[in-house]
Amino acid sequence: TESEELFYADNTFLTLGGTSAIYKRTTNPHTTIGDGLALAFNAGCEIADMEFIQFHPSAIYTESEEAFLISEAVRGEGAYLIDQNGERFMPAIHELAELAPRDIVAQSIYRQMLKYDQEYVWLSLKHLDPQVVKHRFPNIYEKCQELGIDMCDRIPVAPAAHYMVGGVRTDTHGQTNIKRLFICGELASSGIMGANRLASNSLIECLVFGKRAIEASRKNLKTSPTQVFKPIYHCNDNYAALYVHLKKEISRIMTDYAGIIRNAEKLKQGLNELESLEDNLPREINEYYTLICRNLITVARLIIRSALYRQESRGGHFREDYPCSDASYLFHIVQQKEKDLRTLPVNTKKSLN
């Protein structure tokens, strides 16, 4: 119709995914910039545990920053992570070597990259049977071929932002603190992931909590809307370049200051640079590109503030200035618009009622 239309519902569901694309390298689509998170935050939702960002250890490295995921199954098949000298480094770090938890492997790879001033390490499969590799991993093999990489030899890999463990705080039926607003999928923070995430558990979460949210929403059905609003946003194409520039700057800030290995100095520097970016944004509150620029800054700030508050290392959050876990930090960090950051105890006895 080439016109704006509003549809009114008895219940609203947000299923807009995570925030990983605010980092330089991500296994996610480039659109996963956390706009759903910013939307919920600005509406008054409680946002929980945003410091826990999971980085997948092994995504293909290319100069274009494309980060195609190399499954843990490849390492499970026997592939080795090797440094620039061709030496394995994981056996000296963890008893499970290449099969250690994702956060341990990602941190270890990142340290090797810093040590040798390189953008990647190698995932070596040259000691494995090429026919087995091709048969077991046809999709990965095909992708490597497209990129001019011989998977049966070695693959350049580096960590990439993969999953947002935190998100909009919900109960076990997907209900937020705002009545009739439900959140499902990666955008939700139901608490079941803890500080980390086991591979593929998020798929089960979508199925289970999606079904429960639908069942809960049926209690709210009405026959007619109670309020009517007119669209208020417009789009100024002159600001498109501003968005591209700002997204690049924020991905740099998040990668350099709030990435795999963090510390207080870097996190504070990140907050300062975000504030500077925000101060230079246009003042058109209801313009589309300005809105998504502000959303990007909002999401980045939520992550950094939470990471700065948690003065310990736990799960997907590692502080080199606080490298050990601390039992006194066994709580959820909750942020809400125009309210002070607060903490909530972890409910270790939660059941699905």
Regions found by a protein language model. Name each.
Residues 12, 39, 173:
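Hydrophobic/aromatic ligand-binding patch that stacks against planar heteroaromatic rings
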Residues 28-41, 47:
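Thiamine diphosphate
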Residues 82-91, 98, 109-112, 163-165, ...:
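Glycine- and aromatic-enriched mobile tails/lids
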Residues 11, 15-20, 187:
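Glycine-/small-residue-rich beta->alpha transition segments that form the dinucleotide
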Residues 138-182:
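FAD/FMN-dependent oxidoreductases across multiple families
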Residues 4, 23-31, 65-69, 73, ...:
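Alpha-helix capping and helix-loop boundary segments enriched in small/acidic/polar residues
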Residues 3-11, 177-178:
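Core beta-strand elements of the Rossmann-like FAD/NAD(P) dinucleotide-binding domain
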Residues 39, 45-156, 216-222:
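An anion/pyrophosphate-binding glycine-rich loop and adjacent beta-alpha core
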